């Protein structure tokens, strides 16, 4: 049978691999490269070449069992990855990272009341999400959810929106229109609202180009 596959992201390529064992496959791709969200850029730095993933970067065994099995089937080597989060807002006016020490790496944060307001809402967000599964209404976007639950602008603009934008490679303005239920369910499933338990992240050795 002749089968056409539209798109060469992981879904298209994995389907092509399996179906090609018994059928004739043709892949249609609008871009000049295969891979979709997986894209490794090589940066030449003096005598060293650094490989940087611009899209797909990490995965974990808990949330991506099919991907883990697929990589194992292809004999793709993976390694442990260190996942961290840091923010630099308004040309360095506010800077912090996820560790306790990193929170106050910028010494003026000790005396910044707005910073403490953000931290208070981060704690409330973690507890609220873990205990009540966020209590999100149907068809409610992230902006409406944050307003309804009285989360501060400091928490939204300097923590949740930057983190969400980084995860989905999406402009900050668009993140606010995301369905709150989908976004917050992702946070819960990936244990991003758990202070103590975090998933063990892995990445493809040599970049997703492998």
Please place each PLM-identified region on the residue numbering.
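N-terminal Rossmann-like FAD-binding beta1-loop-alpha1 element of flavoenzymes
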Residues: 2-27
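Short, solvent-exposed loop/turn segments at secondary-structure junctions
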Residues: 10-11, 32-34, 165-166
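Glycine-rich FAD pyrophosphate-binding loop
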Residues: 20-44
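N-terminal glycine-rich dinucleotide-binding loop that anchors FAD/FMN and/or NAD(P) in oxidoreductases
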Residues: 41-67
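Mobile amphipathic helical/loop "lid" adjacent to a hydrophobic cofactor/ligand pocket
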Residues: 60-197
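Glycine-/proline-rich flexible loop or hinge segments
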Residues: 47-56, 126, 194-199
């Amino acid at each position: 049978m002749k089968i056409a596959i539209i798109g060469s992201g992981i879904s298209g390529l994995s389907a092509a691999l399996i179906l090609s064992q018994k059928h004739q496959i043709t892949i249609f791709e609008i871009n000049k490269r295969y891979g979709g969200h997986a894209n490794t850029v090589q940066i030449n730095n003096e005598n060293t070449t650094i490989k940087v993933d611009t899209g797909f970067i990490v995965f974990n065994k808990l949330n991506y069992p099919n991907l883990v099995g697929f990589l194992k089937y292809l004999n793709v080597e993976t390694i442990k990855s260190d996942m961290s989060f840091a923010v630099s807002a308004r040309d360095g006016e506010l800077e912090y990272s996820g560790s306790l020490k990193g929170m106050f790496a910028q010494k003026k944060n000790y005396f910044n009341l707005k910073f403490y307001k953000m931290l208070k809402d981060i704690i409330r967000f973690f507890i609220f999400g873990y205990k009540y599964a966020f209590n999100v209404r149907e068809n409610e976007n992230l902006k409406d959810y944050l307003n309804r639950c009285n989360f501060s602008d400091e928490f939204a603009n300097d923590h949740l929106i930057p983190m969400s934008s980084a995860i989905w490679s999406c402009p900050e303005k668009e993140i606010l229109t995301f369905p709150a239920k989908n976004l917050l369910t992702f946070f819960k499933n990936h244990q991003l609202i758990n202070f103590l338990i975090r998933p063990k992240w892995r990445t493809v050795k040599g970049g997703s180009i492998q």
